[in-house]
Amino acid sequence: PIHIVGNGRSSPLHFRPLDGERLQALGAIPIEASDSVVAQVLMEHQSGAVDSLRLSLKYPHQAPPAGQSRARPARASRLRVDPKFTRRMDAETEARIERENELARSVGHKAQDTPQLWTEPFARPRQSKVTSRFGTGRVFNGRVSSSHLGVDYRGATGEPIYAANRGVVALVDSFFLAGNVVYIDHGDGIVTGYFHMSLPKVAVGDTVERGQEIGLVGATGRVTAAHLHWSARFGALTID
């Protein structure tokens, strides 16, 4: 083949040489999937012929027990937050949240066209205790439930937050739920997000290095106390 492209759960797969005979591509598995994800691969030959393959890719780790979804764990954390985050939203607030969600999605989509900017493994944004893991259930004020699509790190207001890897700052904003946010485009479809900051210390377009300070821990948005919520996206999917 002279050209290979793929698609997995609406996110492009960018193939690159692994060795003289094999190719590899980075992809993501949605949290609600059971035990595998389907990828569609097209191979174009020098003759102009195109072959299509539909691949079912199994998880590298054990799937949840029967009847338990990744998106809905067996137990959930019950949290108390400002009532404005759990009462019925007015139309203006709902529209704001949707605009902010679309901004985050657009950063993920644009990252698919950014070349890979990192060479080192991804690092933790803080060397502190993890207080909540990816995929755990959340119930706010006994009413609003959701899945926690990120990792929370303990921190006091004003403590530093560091970039997980090299990349370009794609978004700095103040969101209703996430508070003050910074999104970094690392290329090859990967974006990391840093939520609830008291003070972002970077601007859109800045190139940041792995371990560079990008902001300060805070308690903005829907929180119970100051901490860092760290998230990652691959294209349209929020990933662990």
Which stretches of residues belong to each language-model region?
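Catalytic cores of peptidoglycan-degrading enzymes
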Residues: A123-D240
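Surface-exposed, glycine-biased beta-strand/turn segments
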Residues: R54-A178
